[in-house]
Amino acid sequence: MKKLTKYCFFILFSAIVIIFNLNFLDNSISGYKQYDELKRQIEICCTWGDTLEDGILTFEIINAKPESKELVKAAFSYWDQNLDALRFKEADDKEKVDISVSFGSDNGKVAGQTITNFDSKGFIYSNKIFLAENAFTKKLTNNLIEYIAKHEIGHVLGLGHANFDDSLMSSLVYNINNKIDQCDIEAVMQANKWKLIDNSVVPQLTKNKSYICK
């Protein structure tokens, strides 16, 4: 199946996949813009296609320590509990994997990364999530790992970044918010409206580029 790709690192470029990076950055560093003057909103990136027809997305977790694996499973479960028409399921050996999560240590500034693959119609086909065990030469706490996993799963569900600091979908790890709030949920619903709102069997790409929080 032919795949389309795009790259996203704060700015969206035309290419092969969309890559979202979650970075560590102190709020005092110059160049980090505050968004107080704008409406609070979350970018909408993309839409799942036929894969979501049954309302189930499968995942696998590889190269993870037992404790880290449980944190990622808890992150999937937390999203699962907040989305009525969608369920995450850990794939067995015979199932197609929609979302692959892997761990590594590069001691860089990227704490998490999501790579989204598209089919020829522009729908999400599969995702790969990379989670760092160390960043800035420091081991990440369990709280941070779970937060980053929840953030990356937000990208998996079609979200981009939020334009305000106290959001799970903020592009920077500044003020850790482990909570999935109503704005996150509504944005995911809009990204995948054909299934999660309309309950249709015919996938339709979202026309919304962002969701303004109410």
Predicted regions and their residues:
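N-terminal secretory signal peptides that target proteins for export/translocation
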Residues: 1-3
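Disordered inhibitory propeptide/activation segment of secreted metzincin zinc metalloprotease zymogens
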Residues: 5-68, 76, 113-121, 196-201, ...
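Metalloprotease/metallohydrolase-associated module, dominated by Zn2+-dependent proteases
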Residues: 18-27, 119-121, 125-144, 160-214
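Loop/turn elements at helix/coil->beta-strand transitions in domains of secreted/extracellular proteins
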Residues: 55-56, 84-86, 96-97, 165, ...
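Intrinsic-disorder/low-complexity, polar/charged segments
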Residues: 65, 91-93, 185
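Metzincin-family zinc-dependent endopeptidase catalytic domain
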Residues: 69-156, 160
